[in-house]
Amino acid sequence: MNNYTTINVKNRTAINVKNKDMKMNVTAKWVFTFLFVAAASMLHAGAYTNPVLPYDYSDPDVCQAGEDYYMTSSSFNCIPGLQILHSRDLVHWRFVDAALRWRVPGTEQAASDSPEYGCGVWAPSIRFHKGRFYIYYGDPDRGVYCVRSQATSGAVEAFPLEWEEAVLVKPGKGFIDACPLWDEDGRVYLVHALAGSRAGLKSVLMVCELTADGLACKTESRIVFDGHPDHPTSEGPKFYKRNGYYYIMHPAGGVATGWQVCQRSRSPYGPYETKVVLAQGKTGVNGPHQGAWVGYWFLHFQDVGVAGRIVHLQPLRWQDDWPVMGNEGEPVSQGNVPDKAVSTIGENANPRLFREEFSTTDLPLSWQWSGNYDARYGFCNAAQSMLRLFSYPCDSIPASPSLLLQKIPANRAFTVTAKVRFTPLKKITGHERAGLIVAGRQSYMLDAPANGEWTWLRVTVSQNHDCQFYTSTDGKTYIAVGKPFRAVEGVWIGAKVGLYCTRDRVKINDSGYMDVDWFEIR
């Protein structure tokens, strides 16, 4: 994350665009609401098209509580982490919570230090057990953690929940991709994988027994499956039990090109029979694997490069006590789900238009900071319906924990626009910067003018992720700035777009700031 390019206002070409200066009035909001509801009604006749979530939700897992489904996914270094999405039909998803609100557990460095890109929260599993939600995940540098909710009914109306402090269940480097199983006899098991970069071994799956509360190891882990040589990079296991069989479902073969494997045994420690249950075959869906079995469905991701890992839904049936996924083991492009009322609780996780006007005191859950949270990053000034970001010290903009970012949509072109006003601190003129960022392994920034005046910053992104920055002084005429560039994915995640307000590490007792009137992805 050390590579970056800053675009200043040079080599400009003017174009005229529709004026988006004004905040949406009540009538406009009703129009957008009507259009969204109408579109949802037309699409929600039980049919769906994959991907059901064309955004980066890496390593998704799902559990069921009553008639409600809950999803979480890898959040790595981003905060809030372990975002929780809700659905009634596995197709329409909305944000309802995040289990890690402030920091990645175990990170001892100050929030002002650089984020640990690609580290932190890997491949979580979520379960609802005896009135509590449990989320287990592996941190490749620290071990397996469990985050547990306070007692709850499981109904979506109870969200957001109170979450206990994360517990380090299994300390040690290289333990990743953990999933629990509560057996009928009260015993609790944990399956996990190994990160080769830390453990010096990969492609094996391990099982240990946990204490009754699921918060500590009762036994040492032992290998129950070796993926060498037929199933290399076996990881991301999920643990289930059905008809007396213990099942471990996991991906193998690599993120972009692998397949889904199912293991079954009469004992949690094996020996296990092995079968490939989902693969690309003759379809265009590469690497259809790593996800969740729930009811008659299997959710998994597809790595699409710059936009990250997007979520697909496959039908699932059972034959001879083996799962049959998709269309005889190949992913489907369309399907049908039971027609259920779409929940309106929470923020839509798959909007065609995303527009944030910062009219409340809390940021919506779709926003994530690039590192551990610090209140000095900024705040939502609901009284004036705007966001204020303070300049935060860092070594470089991509290395700042204070980047405020959004996932990008896959498989379509889109435009990002923000109306901003950058007011630097005169005492440190030239040491502060603020603006619009396209973040990834290579990051690109468009600096806002340091004049305390409102300006419009824009980036257009093609379906192939070719980008062009623009600026405007009136929201009507936009001027191309700099050369076109291509967005680049991040470390284990897709590229993101968002905002920055940073400064060099100079000694000062105050800060400049950038106000954001609104931010839009369309």
Functional labels for PLM-detected ranges:
Residues 22-32:
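Bacterial N-terminal signal peptides that target proteins for export
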Residues 2-4, 11, 19-21:
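Intrinsic-disorder-associated, low-complexity terminal segments enriched in Asp/Asn/His/Tyr and depleted
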Residues 30-41:
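Bacterial N-terminal signal peptides
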